[in-house]
């Protein structure tokens, strides 16, 4: 279903969308040549709604297989009907595994990437062999022993601003001049029932750093 011209008349507006996705079947957030990234699928859905290509800009990138519960992106497009009807159209056309949660009209100077205040990663490690097969966000350690105190002590050394080049993977010549220093605000190692959760927060991270 394409929207009628009357719906799309007028000046483009800037929209921000908060979305969540199961990254298992996707090649990360950023557009890929194979067209199977989250951003690719979102732009395909928006083109179906608006009848012409729509460019999106995300607040950050995730690697292949990584899930997100608070990814923000923005795009420009005209819309003459209530905001809620656009959100409903997005929920209709977005593919399985990608969920638009909230939609806002922004001022034209809003930029999802520049407005991002920080990023949080959470790793869930199951300590027992059995776990729910449906929960693909948990990695099973299959009853391997975990020294929680040692992990918590090691976590302290990552807090602060450091050169994290040893923890990243280079993506080519374009990164030679990029600073490898990043500021990590918090690293927590928590025991939650039969899980160990590792939470890392910072202003931003290098490629494959976390």
Regions found by a protein language model. Give the residues of each.
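Structured-RNA-binding interfaces characteristic of tRNA pseudouridine synthases
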Residues: 2-209
């Amino acid at each position: 279903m394409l929207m009628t011209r009357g719906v799309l008349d007028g000046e483009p507006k800037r929209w921000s969308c908060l979305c969540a996705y199961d990254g298992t079947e996707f090649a990360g957030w950023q557009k890929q040549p194979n067209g199977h990234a989250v951003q690719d699928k979102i732009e395909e859905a928006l083109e179906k709604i608006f009848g012409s290509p729509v460019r999106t800009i995300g607040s950050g990138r995730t690697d292949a297989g990584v899930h997100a519960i608070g990814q923000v992106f923005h795009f420009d497009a005209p819309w003459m009907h209530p905001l809620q009807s656009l959100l409903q159209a997005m929920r209709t056309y977005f593919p399985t595994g990608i969920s638009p949660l909230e939609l806002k009209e922004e001022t034209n100077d809003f930029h999802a990437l520049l407005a991002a205040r920080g990023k949080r990663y959470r790793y869930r490690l199951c300590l027992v062999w059995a776990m729910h097969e449906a929960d693909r966000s948990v990695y099973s350690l299959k009853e391997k022993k975990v020294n929680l105190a040692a992990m918590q002590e090691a976590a302290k050394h990552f807090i602060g601003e450091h050169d994290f080049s040893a923890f990243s993977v280079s993506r080519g010549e374009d990164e030679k001049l990029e600073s490898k220093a990043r500021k990590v605000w918090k690293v927590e190692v928590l025991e939650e029932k039969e899980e160990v959760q590792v939470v890392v927060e910072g202003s931003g991270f290098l490629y494959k750093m976390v």
